[in-house]
From Swiss-Prot:
Ranges in a coiled coil: none
Lineage: Bacteria, Pseudomonadati, Campylobacterota, Epsilonproteobacteria, Campylobacterales
EC top class named in words: ligase
Biological source species: Helicobacter pylori (strain HPAG1)
Further details from the record: The reaction proceeds by a bi uni uni bi ping pong mechanism.
Main location as per UniProt: cytoplasm
GO molecular function: ATP binding; pantoate-beta-alanine ligase activity
A GO BP annotation: pantothenate biosynthetic process
Assigned protein family: Belongs to the pantothenate synthetase family.
InterPro entries (alphabetical): Cyt_trans-like, Pantoate_ligase, Pantoate_ligase_C, Rossmann-like_a/b/a_fold
An annotated GO cellular component: cytosol
Protein name: Pantothenate synthetase
Length: 276
């Protein structure tokens, strides 16, 4: 496995790859959710490149960029074990050669980025768009793999690729869950045993909503009330029913409905969702 730390090294490596290239962009602290994305890329492509880069531009003023976990050696060991061909792990100066005030400004499409996570984390998706575009430009992948757990991010990336006419297939990947059904996340390590049990209300609420929909309930207000009842012990940021343009729904639309939840358990903020 190659470990590439500079843009020059990545370009030199990439120019010799003639068959399909799968790309899994990450911020490191890899878990089984990331592993499922990597394994799918390995299965579907001749070469797989994983990026490990904690992107400063997607952190808000009140978010601690310096505290984000960076277990690089552990991440590299996992990638090598899985059979990844190359890991791109650049320093900030490689990805951002200019100071903030000298950089080009990137703006995620407002209709997809202003609500939900965008309303809580101002500028977050602008930073995501910025770094993903740079990575796409450098890696030039055949396919790029994104988890459905970050649903809003996935919709923005799909829109980005279509709007900018990029010849990249975006491969949405199912949400990976632990044995207790909690969605896998790098943030789960911050939960103590009590908080972990409390957090299980999130997948339970989504599962109960799904069961109600399967039985024929289509009124979003009733389904929301059902979910909030299960989430009552948590600090809920939102539980919303939207279509794939993130427009609010009053009635479930088959194949075009997202149920999105964000809630705080102690000091840890968790996301989960249901694609109907």
């Amino acid at each position: 496995m190659r470990v590439l730390e500079t843009i020059a090294a990545l370009r030199e490596y990439r120019k010799n790859l003639e068959e399909s290239v799968g790309f899994v962009p990450t911020m490191g602290a890899l878990h089984k959710g990331h592993q499922s994305l990597i394994e799918r890329s390995l299965k579907e492509n001749s070469h797989t490149i994983v990026s490990v880069f904690v992107n400063p531009t997607q952190f808000g003023a009140n978010e601690d960029f310096s505290a984000y976990p960076r277990p690089l050696e552990k991440d590299l060991a996992l990638c090598e074990k899985l059979g990844v061909n190359a890991v791109f792990a650049p320093k900030i100066g490689e990805m951002y050669p200019y100071e903030a005030e000298q950089r080009l400004k990137f703006h995620a499409p407002t209709f997809l980025s202003s609500s939900l996570e965008g309303a809580v984390r101002h500028g977050h998706f602008d930073g995501v768009v910025q770094v993903v575009l740079k990575m796409f430009h450098l890696v030039n992948p055949t396919r790029a793999y994104f988890g459905k757990k970050d649903a809003q991010q996935l919709l923005i990336i799909q829109h980005l690729v279509k709007d900018l006419l990029l010849d990249i297939e975006i491969a949405p990947c199912e949400i990976a869950r632990d044995s207790d059904h909690l969605a896998l996340s790098s943030r789960n390590v911050y939960l103590n045993a009590t908080e972990r049990k409390q957090a299980l209300a999130i997948p339970k609420a989504l599962e109960n909503i799904k069961q109600a929909i399967d039985k024929g309930e289509k009124a979003c207000e009733k389904l929301k009330k059902l979910g909030l009842g299960i989430l009552e012990t948590l600090e809920v940021d939102y539980l919303e029913f939207c279509n794939h343009k993130l427009e609010p729904l009053k009635t479930i639309e088959p194949t075009n409905t997202l149920v999105l939840v964000a809630a705080r358990v102690g000091k840890t903020r968790l996301l989960d969702n249901l694609w109907v």
